[in-house]
Curated annotation (Swiss-Prot):
Keyword check for RNA-binding: yes
Protein name (Swiss-Prot/TrEMBL): Small ribosomal subunit protein bS18
Gene designation: rpsR
Assembly description: Part of the 30S ribosomal subunit. Forms a tight heterodimer with protein bS6.
Pfam family, one: Ribosomal_S18
Family: Belongs to the bacterial ribosomal protein bS18 family.
Higher taxonomy: Bacteria, Bacillati, Actinomycetota, Actinomycetes, Micrococcales
Length: 78
């Protein structure tokens, strides 16, 4: 029996490229909140559509912002 042909999912567009953002800064909490889930976890690359290098920079910026108390470590909702 033949296997059904699986279609590849459509690649997500890079939100940083479409917004023309080159530098990711830990002080830009409005931008960083787009990459954090409602539970306070950093969203995966496959969800956000950013490149490997940008994902690393986002993760570092989020961790720095959390350390500086600009972003919460977890969600406030319980």
């Amino acid at each position: 029996m033949a296997k059904p042909v699986l279609r590849k999912p459509k690649k997500k567009s890079n939100p940083l490229k479409s917004a023309k953002i080159e530098a990711i800064d830990y002080k830009d909490t409005v931008l960083l909140r787009k990459f954090i889930s409602d539970r306070g976890k950093i969203r995966a690359r496959r969800v956000t559509g950013v490149s490997v290098q940008e994902q690393r920079a986002i993760a570092k910026a989020v961790k720095n912002a959390r350390e500086m108390a600009l972003l919460p470590y977890s969600s406030s909702a319980r």
